[in-house]
Design a protein with these regions (language model features):
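Polybasic/polar functional segments that serve as interface/processing modules
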Residues: 1-134
Length: 134
């Protein structure tokens, strides 16, 4: 008998750069994915300063890149990111996706099922952030 790969449910949110938080217009710049049963929390984001500057010219690209690095550090559980980075992955995901009035906000949380959370994160990043740019 051939073993079938086990599917995993996940939640994800799109990271959005919001030049003017009170207006609400945004540009997708990353994705964060949490698969609780796989103990997975990952993030993909635009990291190139020139690309960030081109995508979101109204925001200081250096500042935006610094914020995105902070999100990555929290996802990775890097202790230099502060106490929230030391919490379990599910708490970090919910902290990252909590509503806030800031230059980086998240979309509503969506759910899905996959076999490989890392690969699914790449697919979501291409779908919602790259959208045909490679």
């Amino acid at each position: 008998m051939i073993a079938r790969p086990r599917s995993v449910s996940y939640d994800f949110a799109v990271l959005r750069a919001v030049p003017h938080p009170y207006i609400g217009a945004f540009v997708p710049v990353g994705v964060v994915l949490h698969a609780r049963t796989a103990d997975y929390l990952g993030m993909r984001a635009i990291t190139d300063i020139d690309e960030l500057r081109a995508q979101v010219p109204e925001i200081d690209a250096e500042l935006l890149a610094r914020y995105l690095r902070s999100v990555r550090a929290i996802c990775d559980g890097d202790e230099s990111a502060g106490p929230v980075a030391l919490t379990p992955p599910s708490e970090r995901f919910h902290w990252l996706t909590a509503p806030r009035s800031d230059v980086i906000q998240t979309s509503p949380i969506h759910e899905g099922v996959c076999f490989d959370p890392e690969r699914e994160l790449d697919v979501l990043f291409r779908t919602y952030v790259r959208r045909g740019s490679g």
